[in-house]
Amino acid sequence: MQIGKILGIEIYGTSSSDEKLSRVRELGLQHGINYKQKDYVDAIKDLTHGEGVDAVFEMLGGEHVAKSVKCLRDFGRVIVYGAATGEIPSLDTRLLYAKGASVHGVWLSYLSANRPLMQSAWKQLSEWLAAGKLHPVIGKVYPLEEARTAYTLLQEGKNYGKIVLKIA
């Protein structure tokens, strides 16, 4: 959200609760959709007057990959960077070529280890952090002994921001 806001991008987002959407609006979200109350494919089409969006950052997996493709405008792309649902995606590729869309996978651990590839990105992020434009969102800090509690919070989708385990 914060990077999109810095870049002046119109940002649409989904969440399971209005409370989380409200908090994310503070980070730059302009159009929030509670996917437990409304189908986000329909909502995106309504909000964009049938056009769809240029890109979707998708981290749920399962059915959400195909649904994300349906949210795209012509020649849009879905960037898959996770599978929080644990479900394997199934995608009818006709959805892609019907609108010239593409799906890209991104594994941040791999990219982070590739210093030459990521050098300019780390430099830019560091500049934004130093300028106070980016603010890491820490949801809660747990002592290591409470790792199970922290993990349960993640599994239940009740977290907001990063959960930190304090080792010492």
Locate each region found by the language model.
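Mid-domain Rossmann-like dinucleotide-binding core that forms the NAD(H)/NADP(H) cofactor-binding site
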Residues: 1-37
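Glycine-rich phosphate-binding loop and adjacent beta-alpha segment
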Residues: 7, 15, 24, 63-133, ...
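Local beta-strand N-terminus motif with an aromatic residue
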Residues: 29, 52-53, 96, 134, ...
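Short amphipathic alpha-helix with an adjacent loop that forms part of the alpha/beta core around
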Residues: 39-50
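N-terminal Rossmann-like NAD(P) cofactor-binding module of classical short-chain dehydrogenase/reductase
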Residues: 56-57, 79
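C-terminal capping/lid region of NAD(P)-dependent oxidoreductase domains
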Residues: 126, 133-140, 148-168
